[in-house]
Structure formats: structure tokens, C-alpha cells
């Protein structure tokens, strides 16, 4: 190993501000000269409609995996793909990458794109969206939002995240750098939760422009990003008069008094039938007297003479209003006009 390579492989213990800027150290054959001790294998099933395509490209798949000392098998009877390590395999993680490649190919990703996952700085993410929305109509509508008219929305997501994105059935397959995969997952999940992807696309476009300015590298970008308010108003009708909740008490409410309890409290319970009847008659006559008294007061209200003080005060008001209403000048002009008529006659 040369001095320059030794300097590159030195492990830094200093704090890192941006983890995405760190370079992933390369894993070479010299790092694992003895190879793998045990054989590892992964298998995945594929649908019937992918059988013809996989049969055509399988020689290319075997050739690609042979470069990494891996074996590949295609079982058309069972409908499965298998990848295995060999005695010459020296990279312990390449079998995981090969497993991801055959998973992507089973999800209708073309071989030219799927083989990119074997690179160190490229990863993949298969996002399951089938169980995020309960109604099928809503699911189809929101999934179509991801694609957009003529695939425009999907193309813009690919350009902004540097990822290959494929919407297929109940899954969204993404392939690209790890930071881009994180952004794709956020956009997909928010879209299925009824947030239009154009909002996240706008935010990514603004972030891309801000990254070009070195002065804003250590600043908070939230003030530049658009803030969208939810305009979906609840369709539930609110009551005009809302009942206020009573204060919580750990004790149960007191038991309401029964008729017998009320009779015991008033002493009526111990009376015989005749005494009870007499008491009821007495209460009835008292109520009738009160009602007759109120009726007489209402009838005699119009015949009650006003008090002297009120009569005097009303007279003063009338005098004041009449004196204030008299116009002296108009009265004088009227008298002069009457005198002129008398003289002329």
C-alpha cells in the first residue's frame, strides 16, 4: 500500500458537520485475502409476466455477477431467482447487493438500472404503499399523483434526487445515492398521506439553489422554504351550543332522592290516607287563591290612579316641551301680516 493510500484510509476522530460529505472508503481484495468460509445464498420469487424478460437477460446477469465471483440461478418452473457466494468471493457485502439486484428485477426494474446497485455509493429502497390508504379509489388517485401527467412529476423527482424511481403495483422502487433515497421515501410517504408531491419538489428545488451559495452553508434554510397551510376543513357540523364538560371527580355522583325519601323528609309518609287528601286539598286551595289574587291585580292595574309626584313631573315636561317649541319670530311675522290685512280691508 502506498503512502497516499495509507493517508486516505486513516480514520478521523474529529467531529463532522455534514456526514453526507464523507467519502466511503473502498473495500479491496487485499482487505480479505482468505475469502468467505461459508456459502451464503438468497432467493426471491418473480411474477409470471417477468419470466420472458428475465430469460432473455439472464446471461447478462450471470456475466455481471461473475465479475464479483457470485453464482446466479434462474428457476422458471418454480419462478425464483437465486444468488450464491463462491470460494473466490472476497467482498462480504456483495451478496446483499446481489440480493437487492434480483429483488429490483422482480419488481420490473430493467437490468441496465438494477445492476447499478452493485456499486458502493448506490443503494436501493422498495417502499410499500399498499397498506397506507384504505380505500382503493383514493390509493389509485394518490399513486397517480406520483407519476403525474405524462410522467412529468416522476421525472422531476428523478432529476432532483438523482435516483431512478419506478411505481409498480403496491410498491415504489427507488435506486440511487443514499441521500436521494431518503428524499424519495419522504416524498412518497407524504404523497400517500394526501400531501401533493409538488410541495416537496418546490422545496427540493429551493434547497438545490441554496446549496450553490457558500455563505448559506452554515445557516438555517427554513426561512427560505415555503410554508403551506392545510386548506381541508372538517365537514363535521359543529353544534351551536357546546356543552361544557364538568370537572372530573373521582367519586361517583350522589344518588337522586326517591319519592319515598322526599315523603320521609317532609313527614308526609307517616300520614294516613285522609290526612294526605286533606293536605292536598289545602295546597290546591292556596294555589287557587294565589292565582285569583294575581288575576285581580292584573285587572285593576288600569284603574289605579297615578301618584301626585308623577302627575306634577309629567305636567312640567309638557310645559317645557311647549315653551321650547314656540318660535317668537314666526309669531311676530304672523301678527304683522294679520294687521296689514285688517288695514287694507
UniProtKB/Swiss-Prot annotation:
Coiled coil: 270-298
Sequence ranges of Basic residues compositional bias: 232-245, 331-345
Disulfide bonds: none
Family to which this protein belongs: Belongs to the KRR1 family.
Residue spans of biased composition, Basic and acidic residues class: 276-302, 315-330
InterPro entries, per the entry: KH_dom (IPR004087), KH_dom_type_1_sf (IPR036612), KRR1-like_KH1 (IPR041174), KRR1-like_KH1_euk (IPR048550), KRR1-like_KH2 (IPR048548), KRR1-like_KH2_euk (IPR048549), rRNA_assembly_KRR1 (IPR024166)
Subcellular location field: Nucleus, Nucleolus
Keyword Thylakoid attributed: no
Species for this entry: Drosophila melanogaster
Keyword Methyltransferase: no
Chief place where the protein resides: nucleus
Keywords for the protein's UniProt record, in alphabetical order: Coiled coil, Developmental protein, Nucleus, Ribonucleoprotein, Ribosome biogenesis, RNA-binding, rRNA processing
Function comment: Required for 40S ribosome biogenesis. Involved in nucleolar processing of pre-18S ribosomal RNA and ribosome assembly. Binds to RNA. Required for female germline development, cell viability during eye development and for survival of dividing cells and epithelial cells during early wing disk development.
Protein name, UniProt field: KRR1 small subunit processome component homolog
GO biological process assignments: rRNA processing
Record note on disruption phenotype: Homozygous mutant larvae show arrested development at the first instar stage as they fail to increase in size or develop into the second instar larval stage and die 2-3 days after hatching, without morphological defect. Mutant larvae show an overall reduction of most intermediate and mature rRNA as a consequence of abnormal pre-rRNA processing. Mutants show defects in rRNA processing and aberrant pre-rRNA species. An abnormal cleavage in the 3'-end of the pre-rRNA occurs within the presumptive 28S rRNA but it does not lead to accumulation of a truncated 28S rRNA.
Residues covered by region (Disordered): 232-260, 273-345
GO function term, MF aspect, one: RNA binding
CDD domains reported for this sequence: KH-I_KRR1_rpt1 (cd22393), KH-I_KRR1_rpt2 (cd22394)
GO CC terms: nucleolus; nucleoplasm; ribonucleoprotein complex; small-subunit processome
Annotated PANTHER family: HIV-1 REV BINDING PROTEIN 2, 3 (PTHR12581), KRR1 SMALL SUBUNIT PROCESSOME COMPONENT HOMOLOG (PTHR12581:SF0)
Quaternary data: Monomer. Component of the ribosomal small subunit (SSU) processome.
Pfam families linked: KH_KRR1_1st, KH_KRR1_2nd
Domain KH: 125-193
Amino acid at each position: 500500500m502506498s503512502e497516499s493510500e495509507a493517508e486516505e484510509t486513516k480514520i478521523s476522530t474529529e467531529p463532522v458537520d455534514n456526514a453526507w460529505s464523507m467519502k466511503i472508503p473502498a473495500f479491496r481484495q487485499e482487505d480479505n485475502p482468505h475469502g468467505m468460509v461459508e456459502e451464503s445464498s438468497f432467493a426471491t420469487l418473480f411474477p409470471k409476466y417477468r419470466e420472458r424478460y428475465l430469460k432473455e437477460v439472464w446471461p447478462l446477469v450471470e456475466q455481471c455477477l461473475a465479475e464479483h465471483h457470485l453464482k446466479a440461478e434462474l428457476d422458471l418452473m418454480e419462478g425464483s431467482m437465486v444468488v450464491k457466494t463462491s470460494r473466490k468471493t472476497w467482498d462480504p457485502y456483495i451478496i446483499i447487493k446481489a440480493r437487492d439486484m434480483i429483488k429490483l428485477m422482480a419488481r420490473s426494474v430493467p437490468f441496465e438500472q438494477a445492476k447499478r446497485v452493485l456499486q458502493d455509493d448506490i443503494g436501493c429502497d422498495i417502499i410499500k404503499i399498499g397498506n397506507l390508504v384504505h380505500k382503493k379509489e383514493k390509493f389509485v388517485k394518490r399513486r397517480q399523483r406520483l407519476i403525474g401527467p405524462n410522467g412529468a412529476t416522476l421525472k422531476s423527482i428523478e432529476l432532483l434526487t438523482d435516483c431512478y424511481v419506478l411505481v409498480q403495483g403496491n410498491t415504489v422502487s427507488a435506486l440511487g445515492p443514499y441521500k436521494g433515497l431518503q428524499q424519495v421515501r419522504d416524498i412518497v410517504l407524504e404523497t400517500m398521506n394526501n400531501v401533493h408531491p409538488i410541495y416537496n419538489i418546490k422545496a427540493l428545488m429551493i434547497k438545490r439553489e441554496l446549496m450553490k451559495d457558500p455563505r448559506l452553508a452554515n445557516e438555517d434554510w427554513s426561512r427560505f422554504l415555503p410554508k403551506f397551510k392545510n386548506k381541508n376543513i372538517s365537514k363535521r357540523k359543529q353544534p351551536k351550543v357546546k356543552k361544557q364538560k364538568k370537572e372530573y371527580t373521582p367519586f361517583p355522583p350522589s344518588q337522586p332522592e326517591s319519592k319515598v325519601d322526599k315523603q320521609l323528609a317532609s313527614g308526609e309518609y307517616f300520614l294516613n290516607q285522609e290526612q294526605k287528601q286533606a293536605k292536598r286539598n289545602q295546597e290546591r286551595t292556596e294555589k287557587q287563591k294565589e292565582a285569583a289574587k294575581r288575576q285581580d291585580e292584573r285587572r285593576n292595574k288600569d284603574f289605579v290612579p297615578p301618584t301626585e309626584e308623577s302627575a306634577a313631573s309629567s305636567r312640567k315636561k309638557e310645559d317645557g316641551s311647549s315653551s321650547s317649541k314656540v318660535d317668537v319670530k314666526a309669531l311676530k311675522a304672523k301678527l304683522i301680516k294679520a294687521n296689514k290685512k285688517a288695514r287694507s280691508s
